[in-house]
Every structure is written in structure tokens, then in C-alpha cells.
Amino acid sequence: MELFMTIFLLVLFCFMSYLCKMYLQMRDQCCYMLAYECYKPGEDRKLGTDTCAKVLMRNKNLGLPEYKFLLRTMANSGIGEETYGPTNVIAGREASPNLADALSEVDDIMFNTLDKLFARTGVSPSEIDILVVNVSLFSPAPSLTARIINRYKMRDNIKAVNLAGEGCSASMVAIDLVQQMFKTYKNAYAIVVSTESIGPNWYNGQDKSMMLSNLLFRSGGCSTLLTNKAALSHQALMKLNCSVRTHIGSDDEAYGCCIQIEDKRGYPGFLLTRKLPKSGAKAFILNLQVLLPKVLPLRELLQSVIKASLSKKKTKSSALEAMAAGLNLKSGIEHFCIHPGGKAVIDELGKSLGLSEYDVEPSRMALHRFGNTSSGGLWYTLGYMEAKKRLKKGDRIFMISLGAGFMCNNCVWEVTRDLEDPNVWKDCLENYPVKSTLNPFMDKYSWINDESIDINSIDQEWLENKLGFQFDPEIIERIRS
């Protein structure tokens, strides 16, 4: 009997030790967000209506049909007049960018946000264990991570990763990478820098599918400080509950729907095809099939399955709408942080997921105020939620991002304390939400679509009065031709 009891106690001790070890490992693998800083350029970088018009007029490959297309697209883009452009574009050098322009653009974003991040948190650059930088369209040597390490004199054993080519979803790729690295490196600090190089990649041709990137993409970025130190959990803004990555690059159609190429005349740019919505929906559905069971209550999932099996009614809804039908996403999610990639993307995701205008407001306003800042866009959306004091302790935030490849990378954060920092929205928060996201382009330049105007009678004085600024006389010849 004593031998049996001894064996039993020994087994029990081993089992309890195992459980304790597993608990400590899981605790150390948590990913906490301590702070984030979004980039805000100076007033001289704003792309107002007139500045945008000047940039468009400088493109010698555009004629009247292209101007009409750009006017219509810009007016309905959901982008306002307060967005920011790269310095070389503002200065009129978009057709001949150089390496110095590219480095200056990303340096300003990276160092500006990192300086503020270190100052806010009190964390020293020498304490950083992991550094991940994601810039899709610019990859110099030495790498951008090396530039940061050199600037801040970081440790020689820092784990540095430079991500390129991941598109608008790159920030979520970086966050997921850090979470995986936290499983190996204990009590670590990690920084993720998410931005894009816009200036050197400005399209100067006339392909409409490639001109879209000029209308949508703007300067911006964000630096985020993360840790797996359990002792700092009380200081965290939020905790990462789960992250799911989906890549459908094996599908040729999906691979080519969002791609960097040269047009027929040799002008480099970023092509967005009509297959993009279909590929995005496919990747998103596959992602949700893995993610939703992780975040929604079992009761909600069972009810959805029962409703789907009992329903025999056929509808014309999209595959995404059909999947979300019957699911109450708000049973496991309070906030929806949709990447502000474009008005159509926000509209479609909001409709398919059954979201209200309140739910999609942060993404709409981020797009209106800052434009599509690529991988940094999600953080401007998150900043809006925080500035509007929406985020309360225990709330869960669903971050949704789509990127070239084609891929969908989503995650769910849990807010660990009430958040109300006005952050990058401080100077303009009282103006939002705006009543209308229509761009004033149509009001000022609607005459371009006026069929009653005799194109051949247009002269320089008449056109300058319409535009409100002087221009190259050859623009008149391009319009007439």
C-alpha cells in the first residue's frame, strides 16, 4: 500500500510539475503591445486638390480620356484633402526619383516614429531584442534594419529581419513573426516598423489599372513596441489573442491580381486587376474558416451550422456573405479594424460581414484623412478607435488585412485597459467623422466632363482660370489630341 501511494504521489508530482512548466511557457509566449506611434508628415507634404491636379498635369503621357478617368476615380475614392505625399512628388520630381529620395522618405518615417516610441515608453534602443522592418517596394543594401541598428547603436546580438514584397498585409506578417519568435526568446522586447516607399514607385504611364496606385497610396507608417514579459502585462495596451495567415499564391489568377510590373511602354508601376476582389474574397474566406473558431463562442458556431443545414433557400449573395450569414461576429468581437485600402474594399467587407456604419467608420475616416498608407494603414484605423475612446478593457479587436501575393493575414487583439490617447489624430479629431467622404475634385474640375465645351477653342488663359494655377502649354495639345 505504501509503495502504491509513493508511486501515485510521484506521478502526481510529475504531472503537476508538467502543468506548471506548460503554464509558465505559455505565459512567456504571450505577445503584449506596449505602444505604437503613427507617422504624421509636415504641412508642406499635403496633397490637396490643387497639388494633386498639378501632379497629374505634369504627366506628359495623359490626355483627356485619362483625365476624365482620374477625375471620376479620385472623386469617389474616399480620400480627403489632408493626405500626405512623398517629397520628390510634391517637388515635381516624380518622373526621375533617385536613391536619395527613397532613403530620405523611409528614414523620416522610421526615425520619427522610433524616436517618439522610445521617448514615450522609456525603453532604450539597447534593450531591443528583436527588430522587424517591412517595406514592400524598397530593399536597399545594407538593409533598412541595418540603418536602424546603426542609427540607434543597438546590440550586436539583436535578431533583425527585413521583410520586402509583402504588400499592404506586411504589418500582420511582421506581428505574427514576432509572436513566433517570442516562443523561442524569453523576456524579450520587439519592435515592428511598418511603412512603404511611395516616391520611387510613382507611376508615370497611362495604363488605367496602374494609375490607381497613384490615387490611393500616400505617405505614412507606424512603429510598434511588443514584449512577452509577463511582468509588463499591466503596462500593455493590448494582448494578441490569435493570428492567422493565409496565402493563395499558388493560384495564378490571385498571384497576378496585384503585382509590380512595367507597362507596354516600359513604365514601372503597380498593377491592380479586376480579379483582385475575387482573389481577396477567396483568401479572406479561407482565413475566416481557421480564425473564427478561435474567437467565437462554441454556441454561436453550432447555431450557425444548424441554420446553414436547415436553410434551403438560395440567394444571390457572395461566397463571403454566405459564409458570414447566420454568424453573429459581435459575440466574440467588439471592434473591426479593416485595412483602409480603398472605399470599395471597406464597403464590400462591411456588407459581407454584416457590419454597421459605426463598425466601418474608423477605416473610412483613416482612408479619408491619411489615404492608403499600405502596411501602416491598420494602425491609423486603430488610432482612430483609441482617440474616439472606443476601446475599453476586455474588448476584442479584429484586424483585417489583404496583401499582394495574394494573401490575407488577420489577428485578434484583446484590450487590457481603457485607452483614450488622441495620438496622431489629435489635431483633427474634432472634425471627424466627416459627413461625406466625396473628394472635392468633382466640384472643382467637373468641367472636364462637360461635353458642350469645344476642345479646340480651349486656350492657355481659359484653362489656367479653370485650374487656378499656371502650367506647361503643351497640356492643351494633349487635351485636344
Name the predicted role of every residue range.
Residues 34-35, 134, 164, 191-196, ...:
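Short beta-strand segments
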Residues 128-136, 162, 336-337, 399:
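Short glycine-rich or small-residue beta-strand-to-loop segments that form or flank ligand, phosphate
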Residues 1-28:
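Terminal signal-anchor or tail-anchor transmembrane helices
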Residues 1-8, 122-125, 392:
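Membrane-lumen (extracellular) interface motif
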Residues 77, 81-84, 104, 135-189, ...:
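Conserved catalytic cysteine-centered active-site region
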Residues 380-400, 405-430:
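Catalytic phosphate/nucleotide-handling subdomain of diverse soluble enzymes
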Residues 27-54, 58, 62-77, 81-88, ...:
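Hydrophobic pocket-lining "lid/loop/helix" segments that shape and contact the acyl-thioester
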Residues 45-46, 142-146, 173-176, 201-207, ...:
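Short acidic, glycine/serine/threonine-rich loops at helix termini
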